[in-house]
Amino acid sequence: MSRTIILIPVSTGVGLTSISLGLIHSLEQKGTKVAFMKPVSQPSTGEDKLDRTTSIIRTSTSLETAEPFMLSVAESLIGQNQSDVLLEKIVANHQQLTKNNDIVVVEGLIPTRKHGYANSINYEIAQALDAEIVLVAAPATETPTELKDRVEAAASLFGGKNNPNLLGVVVNKFNAPVDESGRTRPDLAEIFDSFQHNHISETEVNKLFAGSAIKLLACVPWNANLIATRAIDLVKHLGASIINEGEINRRIRGITFCARSLPNMVEHFRAGSLLVASADRPDVLVAAALAASNGIEIGGILLTGGYKIDAQINKLCRPTFEKAKLPIFRIEGNTWQTALSLQSFNLEVPVDDKERIENIKQYISQHFNADFINNLVADSSRLPRLSPPAFRFQLTELARAAKKRIVLPEGDEPRTIKAAVLCAERGIAECVLLADPASVQRVAEAQGVKLGKGITIINPADVRENYVDRLVELRKAKGMTETAAREQLEDTVVLGTMMLEANEVDGLVSGAVHTTANTIRPPMQIIKTAPGSSIVSSIFFMLLPDQVLVYGDCAVNPDPTAEQLAEIAIQSADSAKAFGIDPKVAMISYSTGTSGSGADVEKVKEATRIAKEKRPDLLIDGPLQYDAAVMEDVARSKAPNSPVAGKATVFVFPDLNTGNTTYKAVQRSADLVSIGPMLQGMRKPVNDLSRGALVDDIVYTIALTAIQATQ
């Protein structure tokens, strides 16, 4: 029996879309199958078009959603006194969602001046769907006590404490910036420095609702990073022409109007700042070029007045702007007109801003009461599935519990520093950055991040000598001398490996700059393979829309023998199990069963036999073609008696060419997130990054490494 939760906003401006996304993410992290519906579309423009939440969920997830009724259709039926007809149609849509989902999250209508009927319709929808009600509120000009009173007044419209289906309230956006009248600003003005902030502690809010009949289910503090828009969004809003595209998706975290003399403005030339200046201010352009050349990621430059950049200044600055990928755009209006236009910019998250959507999901989900979420999923009649959000959540939780220390040899690389900061903030691991502390601090400031607790910076020059004797001892048989050892320890990967060998750290992650060979070679020479392992292999975790699959080996072994392939299969199955995936191993080939022949097929057959013999406890079958392994209808015709075909979770490829090609084809064609490669078979955990790795990729690789260190 599925459950239905309806989120009902107490007023406008409560951040309803964000709360919907966060709640859904919290439920998915528990492995619950969730669906979403907005019974009546209510876009902020008032037009008849799809609402923002449904659009976001359809473009960023694979969740089942209902088609909402357009506002004009709903209003027409309400106006003709046919609310019952509208409700019947809503119930029909809802019933379709309950068939295959554990929980249906419903988003209610927002009460506005134009939609004064919203609360009565929300109540009728909640009744019709037998939905449990969660109110969503945000402080406006009230004190905490006044907010509580307003929530309780709103709750009374839905039966208050006498309604067992009224679960409680989510308080969002507390301590948001307000203008002089005390109003929360829903536009770009929120990121100007001129607005005041309330200073209410979360403890105050919790204490206040502790004495209320309405339970506090989540208390979400204001987070300015969640409204950091992209340069391209401002370009579209202003109708600006692009002079230098650069990283047009770069985040804008503040605005500086360059109307003063340069000495009075230069402190605002910082990461994420949008500099608004007349194009006839060459001093601003030159200063911005200098800042960019020093690694400061300015958010962008907006030139006003319609002037063209002076040719000599353009010639001087353009190479720096292009190298720094600094977005520069121009509009015809003057600075005053531009300021007015920026004030009208709506900061609702764009449907295509996947990074911001993901950040909102993660942030909001962290603030839900754990007991509330656990109680929602406790009655689920289906077996939990390991969805991608559930897998990522599990990685984070396991890494937190592990409390490991991970060394990052590329300690002053910008993405690595950002990842280390995130790991520290989330408690994923203590990161050790190997780099000159001054260099790390300089890069961190340029990136706009703060290095806090949970990060250790070690200057390689200060500690290299500590490992010379041990390296000579370990590699003496290979002719290692003190001079050669000192030279090798200049390589921070070698230095990090020696720290790992000495048990000073628990794992190593590298590869954002180094090649795979440079990352793996020192650990192979110094750490060596684990007992019982003859080779090192790798796997990728492929995060499909509704499940997580394991692909191996896609990164290390070019052409493994049958014995090695069997070992890769066993390693991959054990890794899958360690990370919560039930291993059903498919040995992939170009033929299924006995339908083909040749050396490659025979190798897979033999590898399957060896793996089954060594580990009879594992479900392993092969050779299987990829479609037979993954698709149930194909499996029924090609391998009807296979215990794995059609439901494989671990895919073992016969060689690196096949594995790497398949991994990249599936990842790119389906626009999937993958985590890895994760190395298997090492005595201590070492993991390689792609040189194109994103910050999140590095974070999850650090988490994987921390978890491996416990095994």
From Swiss-Prot:
EC number per UniProt: 2.3.1.8
Keywords from the named record: Acyltransferase, Cytoplasm, Transferase
InterPro entries, per database record: DRTGG, P-Actrans_bac, P-loop_NTPase, P_AcTrfase, P_AcTrfase_dom1, P_AcTrfase_dom2, Phos_Acetyltrans/Butyryltrans, PTA_PTB
Domain of life assignment: Bacteria
BP-aspect Gene Ontology terms: acetyl-CoA biosynthetic process
Entries under Pfam families matching the protein: AAA_26, DRTGG, PTA_PTB
Residue numbers spanned by region Phosphate acetyltransferase: 390-711
Gene3D superfamilies named among the record's database cross-references: 3.40.50.10950, HprK N-terminal domain-like, Isocitrate/Isopropylmalate dehydrogenase-like, P-loop containing nucleotide triphosphate hydrolases
Function: Involved in acetate metabolism.
Written domain comment of the UniProt record: The N-terminal region seems to be important for proper quaternary structure. The C-terminal region contains the substrate-binding site.
Family: In the N-terminal section; belongs to the CobB/CobQ family.
Name of the featured protein: Phosphate acetyltransferase
The organism of origin for this protein: Haemophilus influenzae (strain ATCC 51907 / DSM 11121 / KW20 / Rd)
